[in-house]
Amino acid sequence: MTTSTQHKLVSLGVSLPLMEAFYTIQGEGYHKGAASYFIRIGGCDVGCHWCDVKESWNANTHPPTAVADIVTEASKYSDTVVVTGGEPLTWNMEPLTNALKDKGLQIHIETSGAYPLTGQWDWICLSPKKLKKPTTDIYPLADELKIIVYNQNDLQFAEEQAAKVSADCKLYLQPEWSKRETVMPLIVDYVMKNPQWRVSLQTHKYLNIP
């Protein structure tokens, strides 16, 4: 297959730049503790300096993989699939989610919301970033809002973002891993005073699993 053909298939969403896929325990947010199959799609231009998967940014370093092959592997594991990145909405997610739905799987997405929403999702975890704000249409669709807290200023950003989601959206504050010792007391105090928020931890890192 020629490079131009591969690029066309990726642009259509029939193939995707797959960084990795693995079966593990969801470590964050509302579904923490649940067995899930993760599909990590390469490509992201949001540019968070504290990102713990910077190797996902350049889509060209990850092989274009046919959606059919991705789904065949995913269907061997949990009934829940989490699509993450990178920023998965860089690409057309319709072919992937349609194929996963055909297998009867529950499909979650973790996204910054920086690009228009494509695909059919059972759960949308919106994690907005200051450098590239979400598109306005995703806010009312978010089931979960997860704000990464690097410093105290992020608490104000969290409230600005929470004002845009639906009343049913679950609200989470999660410490940026390298700053957890510093910001965790801030988060705990804030959640105690503002109980509409919950604390999210990267429990998979404490468990030493992917």
Model-found features: residue ranges?
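Conserved Radical SAM active-site core
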Residues: 3, 16-23, 35-38, 42, ...
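Compositionally biased amphipathic helical and low-complexity segments enriched in hydrophobic
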Residues: 10-13, 156
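A generic structural micro-feature
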Residues: 31-33, 139
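Short amphipathic alpha-helical segments, especially helix-boundary/capping motifs
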Residues: 12-13, 44-48, 70-73, 132-135, ...
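Conserved AdoMet/S-adenosylmethionine-binding subsite of the radical SAM
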Residues: 89-210
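Polytopic alpha-helical membrane-helix bundles and their juxtamembrane interface segments
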Residues: 3-11
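A short beta-strand-turn-helix
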Residues: 26-29
